[in-house]
Amino acid sequence: MLRLARKGLQTAVVRSYAKDVKFGAEGRQAMLVGVNLLADAVSVTMGPKGRNVIIEQSWGSPKITKDGVTVAKSIDLKDKYQNLGAKLIQDVANKANEEAGDGTTCATVLARAIAKEGFESIRQGGNAVEIRRGVMNAVEVVVAELKKISKKVTTPEEIAQVATISANGDTVVGNLISDAMKKVGTTGVITVKDGKTLNDELELIEGMKFDRGYISPYFITSAKGAKVEYEKALVLLSEKKISQVQDIVPALELANKLRRPLVIIAEDVDGEALTTLVLNRLKVGLQVVAIKAPGFGDNRKNTLKDMGIATGATIFGDDSNLIKIEDITANDLGEVDEVTITKDDTLLLRGRGDQTEIEKRIEHITDEIEQSTSDYEKEKLNERLAKLSKGVAVLKIGGGSEVEVGEKKDRVTDALCATRAAVEEGIVPGGGVALLRSLTALKNYKAANEDQQIGVNIVKKALTQPIATIVKNAGLEPSSIIDEVTGNSNTSYGYDALNGKFVDMFEAGIIDPTKVVRTALQDASGVASLLATTECVVTEIPKEEAVGGPAGGMGGMGGMGGMGGMGF
């Protein structure tokens, strides 16, 4: 019989399913502490005179940011109940960011105001469900009013204004985004990347560019820059690896006969096939180059199909194409006006594909983007779409340090999203004025019952909070500013917190995209009013640690000496 000595081993029973439960006002109050903590941290960034927040990171330098959603995401509270409240408001910021790309700080401020007032009304005996209904009905009325005061954005100047506001008054960024949209269109692909200089730059990548270069340096035609450059080239596409000589000889003969350069893009080119290509290039002077197809799996298959449609080439090795590569004809080869290949990337310019087929492919990819739920997938689909249409605009963000570039990239990404939103649904006066002006729509609104009217009053109070926060961050008393703004009949009259004066917000270029304000209000009211209807909060009790460390427990292993007594 095996007997283990237990000396030194002390265990604690761990009930992983143990929960802690709080009801009513106690649970809501605990969550409200978390809501307030997160909202306080986020609201300091609001407006032109908002402050920065420094966030400790588990790796690298601390992050300095004025981006609301970044601040919200960084907050994780020790107290479980407080953390639940904070996480729900985080969701509001995330949702606003996903839908409109901006307005996260505004959404957070609104959510806190609605949750706080909602909790108080319920504490005083209001019906939570009816109050929520009143909040949602009031929000519908306000959204309709926002659409009424909204103006369309059409000119490059207006686009630059929107981008400048979202980039915290950075006119360079505003003009850069406006130029990018001018070049690739308002629905074109614009990406934001780290630059390699101190200045911000705009680069337009036309045609089909992908990150795969020549397979062998022996294909180089231009010593300067170690590039392969050809004009009026033929394109051979293959989904499969090309290794045999007989696979490429017919294509080489065709290219030679037509006196045109040949670009081979395949899964890989190696063995005898690669040797033959290199020898023909060096000894005969044949204009040829081989490139590995970009991506993997379905991504590679789709990219090759895009190339085939853009250049008019047949894809060999494709399941739908039964023709063998050795039976190639001139009609199976695609055409491009220019091709430039370095060791790292390839650029195909002005493919000669059928325009009708290209448009069909663009429609197909657009449908896929609409149906996709993955951000990564959407990004890849947008890149493919851009390569088939107007190209990709790349905003290269410069700066003196990694921290500076990171902070600027956050602002540029926000500005880009806000600008797209403005083009989509128009603009309203900025600085919290649009929401304040929407109060007039609720002036004569009568709710179905007393509790719903409480919900309407909660929204009325919340609508004053964004402008109040902006003014407070500028170091002024909000009530006098709000009275001055509401006392003027001009709907675009508001307060310029940056320069400390009252102006016509549209004329001064202080504007917000309608979509940003609308989504901020809808997301905030939805989550915050639901939070107010909470009657029970359940959290996990942290697991107890085993008493005595692993080293102490090992002392009991001395009993293993009894193993000698085991008989079989």
From Swiss-Prot:
Gene Ontology MF terms in the entry: ATP binding; ATP-dependent protein folding chaperone; protein-folding chaperone binding; RNA polymerase II-specific DNA-binding transcription factor binding
Leader peptide range in chain numbering: none
GO annotation (BP), single: protein refolding
Record flagged with keyword Amino-acid biosynthesis: no
Subcellular localization: Mitochondrion matrix
Pfam families tied to this protein: Cpn60_TCP1
Keyword Nucleus part of the UniProt annotation: no
Keywords per UniProt: ATP-binding, Chaperone, Mitochondrion, Nucleotide-binding, Transit peptide
Family matches, as InterPro entries: Chaperonin_Cpn60_CS, Cpn60/GroEL, Cpn60/GroEL/TCP-1, GroEL-like_apical_dom_sf, GROEL-like_equatorial_sf, TCP-1-like_intermed_sf
Expression induction: By mitochondrial stress.
Cellular component terms (Gene Ontology): mitochondrial inner membrane; mitochondrial matrix; mitochondrion
Family: Belongs to the chaperonin (HSP60) family.
PANTHER family: 60 KDA HEAT SHOCK PROTEIN, MITOCHONDRIAL
Function text: Implicated in mitochondrial protein import and macromolecular assembly. May facilitate the correct folding of imported proteins. May also prevent misfolding and promote the refolding and proper assembly of unfolded polypeptides generated under stress conditions in the mitochondrial matrix.
Name this protein carries in UniProt: Chaperonin homolog Hsp-60, mitochondrial
Gene name as annotated: hsp-60
